[in-house]
C-alpha cells in the first residue's frame, strides 16, 4: 500500500458521527405547520365571518401539532450526538416557531371570542404579512440542508415585521381617531 493508498484510507475514516439529519425533517414539519396555521388565519380574515369557529379549530389543531413537534425536537436534542447546529440555536428556533403558532392561535381565538362581524383592512393586511413571513421561514428552513446562509431570508422577515408594525400602528391610530370623532359627535348632540 503506497502513501496515497494510506491517505485515501485515512480520509474515508470518520472521526465524528454524521450530523443528525432527523432535525431537518422535524424543523420542516414545524414551519410547514405554522405556515398552515397562517394560511387558515388569512382565510379567516378574508372569508365568511360565520366560519370563524371552523378556522379557529383548524388553527388550534396546528398549534397542538407544533407543540408536539417542538417537544420531539427537544427530545432529539437530548439524545443526539451531533446536531446540525448548536443545540441552543435549534432550541431557540423551535421555541420561536411555537411562539408564532401561539400568536396566530391567539389572533384567531380573539376573532371568535369577540364575535367580530367582519375583519377590517388592517386585519387582512396583517394576516397576509404573517403568511408571507411564514412562507419565508419555510423557504429558509428547506434550504438549510444544503445552504447555511439564511441571512437574506432573515432580512426579508425583518422587513415584513417592520411593515406589520407600521400597519398595526396605523390601524390603532385610525381607531383612536374614530373614537375621538365619535365622542365629538356625541358631545355636539348633548349640547344641541
Model feature map: region roles:
Residues 1-192:
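Cytosolic, long alpha-helical scaffolding segments
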Amino acid at each position: 500500500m503506497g502513501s496515497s493508498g494510506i491517505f485515501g484510507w485515512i480520509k474515508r475514516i470518520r472521526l465524528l458521527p454524521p450530523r443528525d439529519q432527523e432535525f431537518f425533517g422535524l424543523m420542516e414539519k414545524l414551519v410547514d405547520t405554522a405556515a398552515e396555521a397562517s394560511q387558515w388565519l388569512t382565510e379567516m380574515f378574508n372569508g365568511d365571518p360565520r366560519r370563524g369557529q371552523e378556522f379557529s379549530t383548524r388553527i388550534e389543531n396546528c398549534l397542538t401539532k407544533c407543540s408536539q413537534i417542538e417537544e420531539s425536537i427537544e427530545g432529539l436534542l437530548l439524545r443526539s450526538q451531533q446536531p446540525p447546529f448548536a443545540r441552543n440555536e435549534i432550541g431557540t428556533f423551535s421555541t420561536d416557531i411555537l411562539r408564532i403558532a401561539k400568536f396566530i392561535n391567539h389572533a384567531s381565538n380573539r376573532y371568535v371570542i369577540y364575535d367580530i362581524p367582519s375583519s377590517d383592512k388592517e386585519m387582512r393586511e396583517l394576516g397576509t404579512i404573517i403568511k408571507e413571513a411564514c412562507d419565508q421561514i419555510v423557504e429558509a428552513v428547506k434550504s438549510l440542508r444544503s445552504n447555511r446562509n439564511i441571512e437574506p431570508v432573515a432580512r426579508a422577515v425583518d422587513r415584513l415585521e417592520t411593515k406589520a408594525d407600521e400597519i398595526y400602528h396605523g390601524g390603532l391610530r385610525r381607531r383612536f381617531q374614530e373614537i375621538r370623532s365619535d365622542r365629538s359627535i356625541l358631545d355636539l348632540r348633548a349640547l344641541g
